[in-house]
Amino acid sequence: MALLGKRCDVPTNGCGPDRWNSAFTRKDEIITSLVSALDSMCSALSKLNAEVACVAVHDESAFVVGTEKGRMFLNARKELQSDFLRFCRGPPWKDPEAEHPKKVQRGEGGGRSLPRSSLEHGSDVYLLRKMVEEVFDVLYSEALGRASVVPLPYERLLREPGLLAVQGLPEGLAFRRPAEYDPKALMAILEHSHRIRFKLKRPLEDGGRDSKALVELNGVSLIPKGSRDCGLHGQAPKVPPQDLPPTATSSSMASFLYSTALPNHAIRELKQEAPSCPLAPSDLGLSRPMPEPKATGAQDFSDCCGQKPTGPGGPLIQNVHASKRILFSIVHDKSEKWDAFIKETEDINTLRECVQILFNSRYAEALGLDHMVPVPYRKIACDPEAVEIVGIPDKIPFKRPCTYGVPKLKRILEERHSIHFIIKRMFDERIFTGNKFTKDTTKLEPASPPEDTSAEVSRATVLDLAGNARSDKGSMSEDCGPGTSGELGGLRPIKIEPEDLDIIQVTVPDPSPTSEEMTDSMPGHLPSEDSGYGMEMLTDKGLSEDARPEERPVEDSHGDVIRPLRKQVELLFNTRYAKAIGISEPVKVPYSKFLMHPEELFVVGLPEGISLRRPNCFGIAKLRKILEASNSIQFVIKRPELLTEGVKEPIMDSQGTASSLGFSPPALPPERDSGDPLVDESLKRQGFQENYDARLSRIDIANTLREQVQDLFNKKYGEALGIKYPVQVPYKRIKSNPGSVIIEGLPPGIPFRKPCTFGSQNLERILAVADKIKFTVTRPFQGLIPKPDEDDANRLGEKVILREQVKELFNEKYGEALGLNRPVLVPYKLIRDSPDAVEVTGLPDDIPFRNPNTYDIHRLEKILKAREHVRMVIINQLQPFAEICNDAKVPAKDSSIPKRKRKRVSEGNSVSSSSSSSSSSSSNPDSVASANQISLVQWPMYMVDYAGLNVQLPGPLNY
């Protein structure tokens, strides 16, 4: 029986017989029994090829029964359930004054509850109600001609229907309390908010003196708004006449309304941080006088209001924009509803705006101001001792809100009431200007306690910090570009940040993990080399591209510090590597080889938490740590032959060494003419191939790192289950069952998820703490142990070993095809993109040639049985590996580098045999064409289905 049992809080309207009252104590059991019988009848009908879909509603519960297809139909169309439930309760959207006047009186405090069957998240309904309440308050204030927002007196207006006329409500809706509307009605009101008008038929006698203004037009108060009183009592503060033009008093609030959101892709392009200046009338949309909207009004709002909600079952916060007042209430009000809203919502834009409001408000409180001011993030990052941030959750660095993800934003908002800023001293201007000046004796010393300072110094500090925090309204948005400048000093003659919105700020000199995490916010998941080059390019080139002359000392000072450190570390690595291979002069370290073979090629003596990477990937703190431990750093090479696999760049210092590696360096004339086109073309071609191969090697490194992390997670998960071999981690089921599996030991700031979602830098950080990672299963759940296959139940651990053996076989055969007496790593991606370049014979008939990671255990066994017959023949030389051997054939002149496309393989997706490069596929042009159309990057462990975990293996395995 498929039982939803969603309880609804809507009071019944007498839809059921009186005998189903609560006086009948066993009515729930009888109803459940009858529904079960109904489900049995549906099962019997399904055996006769009949399909049934049934919705049963009783009191506060809804039941869905039927055949399998019928239940799928109803579950996919939950609006049918909610419509039927409302139909049983009576016609929707009726005027409560005519139908149920007593219920209106009774619900004035909290209102009637809404049927939850039409909405999954109660906190989203709460947000919609607050937004509709804001709309009504603004329209009522406009009708009064007030410059401030006045709460609408629902009790009096509903008691005297002739007092207020409401026009423009959606068809079928009557004016009542927002708490009495259902979610669809709330969304309809928000969609038509620009058409709604309030008109007072007769003036209120006490409305002028008893209305309470909640939000002034010159800014939002930092005091939490709290609960709102619907009655007409409370004194309204006087509004200065200069705060608002006379022409803007009556109709200027019309733009302070709500509408449904734009599509998700358009939302991402919008600015994602709230305005960090004091909320002026322009920020609330109240400063621009608007005429009475007619046809033009509907046209202006057509883009915002044309989108319908995706469905009543989804979280409606994805489909609405919350006003700044609502967001301010979320941040400052201590309400369980807002706490539930923060936990349930996944809208990153709303969360970022809330965190931005939180930081700006707390910073203003620290300055003693009564309005929000923008936080000078760059100044705090460069001079962290000036401002202390208290209460931020552990392992979350203080950064711009646009650099946080959803989990960190939620954690910050959960601790929002305990977060505070403490101003310790003024910012050291030498950090931002690079000038050396005599320190003013009136300024606060860093080491002196705050109580030793005079009131004048404190006042000067506040004015300086507040003045630096303010900026021109034209450039005040500070919205979501990670390097956006929000603290451009409006009163200062020198800009301290560039205007380019696309620059990522990575100039943090302290040893905090901010600079490393900023690289994760760069577009895409770059490998470690890309991250290093990207950071260097952005800091050294991008930041100074549009900078003024007086700004350049700031960037030069930071670059002057980090560049020599990088050169020293690079020289250190090259010297230690040359010593390990027996060469006296420094040799460039093949970082990719060390990352691809961590067991045979590694480095000892590095500081704790630092792995071998290019020096460009390190910040100042880690570079200094490496130099401090320079005497203990040593390169260990267990298998020297790995260094010669796939190497194209010979060591030009020694001809004998180059020859021993199987290369013949190009014989250039001693005096070459710079204008020789042949020489220039050969040099260009060589540089192009080097860049192309470097890109391929970085991709291979990233794939290798992901495979290693995946193997690590599978191994740790198997250990948590008490099994001695790896087990495929059920990521989706672990995510859907929070708390069932606890993962400990991950680096700070790295959440547990699929390795394919990490960049190379985070993958390296995970591998660096592999010994500390631990899985703990706290409670079982469905899918904890995958269902075993019939044939593979007893042989799951063997697949890893067989796969490595097939890899070694293919590498050996590929080396023989190149005319070398050693194994060579097979370029599976290049062969897949050019299936005619290499012909593989001797494989079993039903097995195409591809990456061994994609084979199942049966195919791996068949290949190993036929290993003596496997042969590889190179027909057309692969371009990036053209220099790997001396006897390779010269490629055709018109051959071009194949374009590669990367697609990730989803879980359980089988790789089609169209990527085969065997003789059968080379003779079939259709299969070759399909192979060129679909280019896949195989993630090896994601296609492994470890099952039968409680079955003993026949013997010990050396994993």
Swiss-Prot record:
InterPro entries: GTF2I, GTF2I-like_rpt_sf, TF_II-I. Its main location: nucleus. Keywords: Developmental protein, DNA-binding, Isopeptide bond, Nucleus, Phosphoprotein, Repeat, Transcription, Transcription regulation, Ubl conjugation, Williams-Beuren syndrome. Residues 96-117, 230-250, 468-492, 654-679, 892-927 are annotated as: Disordered. Pfam families: GTF2I. One of its GO terms (molecular function) is RNA polymerase II cis-regulatory region sequence-specific DNA binding. Highly expressed in adult skeletal muscle, heart, fibroblast, bone and fetal tissues. Expressed at lower levels in all other tissues tested. There is a cross-link at residues 27, 94, 184, 212, 225, 238, 271, 294, 308, 337, 436, 439, 443, 567, 579, 588, 622, 638, 684, 724, 732, 772, 774, 787, 829, 889, 893 (Glycyl lysine isopeptide (Lys-Gly) (interchain with G-Cter in SUMO2)). It comes from the Eukaryota. Interacts with the retinoblastoma protein (RB1) via its C-terminus. This is General transcription factor II-I repeat domain-containing protein 1. It comes from Homo sapiens (Human).
